[in-house]
Amino acid sequence: METTKRIALFTGTFDPFTIGHQSIVARALPLFDQLIIAVAVSKLKHTQAEISARVAAIEAVYAGNPAITVKAYDDLTVEMAAREGAHFIVRGVRSVTDFEYEREQADINRQLSGVETVLLFAEPQLSSLSSTMVRELQFFGKDVSAWVAKPTHDKDIQAISADNHNKKQV
């Protein structure tokens, strides 16, 4: 009897990839045979780090784990899922606001392609953590190492610091 691999996408801009994201990956991994961390090129969100830097930083976190791959995409999530043979989308939820947004997205994704969304709730101590908060703290020169997944921290700090330095000189 042949079984189908359970492939899931964990999607986001991951700018930067935080310990909250890392927690979702750790908890999603046992549920699936393969987890693709799908890094979005979003025209609707302003990102600090280039897509190649975000992908490389996340790849460094999961180097050597054959169950995890990291890929960039710039189209609809359901189109990425179809290309990769993924039948599931994993999303993290921190709040009621996140839940409402994710429920709406899940409904549309299911209507478009039949893909199912699996929601994992943030651990309580991580429910206030967001990439936006980390970027803001970085902008003001604060140490964010406690919230950024290792080894992405050093690469992100260098990229953000260089970017902020260039903006201040203009």
Regions found by a protein language model. Name each.
Residues 1-170:
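Nucleotidyltransferase catalytic core that binds NTPs
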